[in-house]
């Protein structure tokens, strides 16, 4: 594969010149990265509906195509052909900009995700920090949508979502600190390679548990979907959106679900490393997909199983339970590392 890519690059430089080929090659890499992500996001919606249907003893989508396999395409066509309605009192520029900001920040994070030692768009030394920064920017799009809609339900949903994302991002970030301490790097590839022989999910199990619950809350998924609580806020910050402006929020949410699942796999479950050395003949990207799929399954299972939290319970859990525990966990891991070094 490396030789094939090198030959393509050599041909491109020969025909287009180094400057133009660099631009074309960058665009090609971005397209090759984004296309599978959008495909996975689209069919994750079908997987969710089928899985929840199974858990609720019903069929789920089964009319469009064989076993409903074309349902996501039908939904995409429906969103594309619908008219984008702008509320009369909305701030129009910000109203359109908000879903674009949310969707773009959800995709930009993928630039630093390594799918294998060689398969990464941008191998930066601060990959973890970059992903956390991009996830923080997503809160601005949601808050902006609530404000720009200029309606009560949307504003309340935007404020709820921003507060929730900021609250749980703190504990999520703190749970990643022990992983960085053990690996000695912010580079995702180095963190995966440091887990040879022992995945960090085993010695850092409490942190892994808090990480998973925190990312469920940060992505506004059930049972923490307070910003979109239908019984209270109609549809929260998405109330006034339709067509592809609504679709961008929808795609951004599911792209974030896959993103935090991949990040959890890389940080705690060994990424592309096999569980035992005897299975190393299986390509690393297969292991990464399997581990990510397991985490995504738990996202969907939680939605079908648990009732929604009250907002005060949600905030109390984040600030009074997870934040102190994650801080104490950093201290415990640091103390254990110090004592082991002394021994």
Swiss-Prot record:
GO CC annotation terms, alphabetical: plasma membrane
Assigned EC number: 7.1.1.-
Membrane topology, as annotated: Multi-pass membrane protein
Transmembrane segments: 21-41, 95-115, 124-144, 172-192, 197-217, 257-277, 281-301, 317-337
Keyword hit for Ribosomal protein: no
Subcellular localization, as worded in the UniProt entry: Cell inner membrane
The protein's enzyme class: translocase
Entry's Gene Ontology BP terms: aerobic respiration
Self-association state and partner proteins as the record states: NDH-1 is composed of 14 different subunits. Subunits NuoA, H, J, K, L, M, N constitute the membrane sector of the complex.
Family of the protein in this entry: Belongs to the complex I subunit 1 family.
Protein name, as recorded: NADH-quinone oxidoreductase subunit H
Lineage: Bacteria, Pseudomonadati, Pseudomonadota, Alphaproteobacteria, Magnetococcales
The gene coding this protein: nuoH
């Amino acid at each position: 594969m490396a030789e094939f890519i090198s030959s393509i690059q050599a041909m491109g430089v020969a025909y287009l010149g180094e400057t133009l080929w660099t631009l074309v090659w960058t665009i090609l890499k971005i397209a090759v990265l984004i296309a599978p992500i959008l495909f996975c996001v689209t069919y994750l919606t079908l997987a969710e509906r089928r899985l929840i249907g199974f858990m609720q003893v019903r069929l789920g989508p089964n009319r469009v195509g064989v076993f409903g396999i074309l349902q996501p395409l039908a939904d995409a066509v429906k969103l594309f052909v619908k008219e984008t309605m702008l509320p009369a009192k909305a701030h129009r520029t910000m109203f359109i900009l908000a879903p674009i900001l949310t969707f773009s920040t959800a995709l930009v994070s993928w630039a630093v995700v390594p799918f294998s030692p060689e398969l990464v768009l941008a191998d930066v030394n601060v990959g973890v920090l970059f992903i956390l920064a991009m996830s923080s920017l997503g809160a601005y799009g949601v808050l902006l949508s609530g404000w720009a809609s200029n309606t009560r339900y949307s504003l309340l949903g935007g404020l709820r979502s921003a507060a929730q994302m900021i609250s749980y991002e703190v504990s999520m970030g703190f749970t990643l600190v022990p992983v960085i301490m053990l690996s000695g790097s912010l580079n995702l590839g180095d963190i995966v390679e440091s887990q040879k022989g022992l995945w960090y999910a085993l010695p850092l199990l409490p942190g892994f548990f808090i990480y998973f619950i925190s990312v469920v809350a940060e992505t506004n998924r059930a049972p923490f979907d307070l910003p979109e609580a239908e019984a209270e806020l109609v549809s929260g910050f998405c109330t006034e959106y339709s067509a592809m402006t609504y679709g961008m929020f929808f795609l951004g949410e599911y792209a974030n679900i896959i993103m935090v699942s991949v990040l959890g796999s890389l940080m705690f479950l060994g990424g592309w490393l096999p569980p035992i050395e005897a299975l190393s003949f299986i390509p690393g990207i297969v292991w990464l997909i399997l581990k990510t799929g397991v985490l995504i399954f738990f996202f969907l299972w939680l939605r079908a199983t648990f009732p929604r939290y009250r907002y005060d319970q949600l905030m109390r859990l984040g600030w009074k339970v997870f934040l102190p525990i994650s801080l104490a966990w950093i201290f415990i891991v640091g103390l254990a590392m110090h004592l082991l070094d002394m021994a």
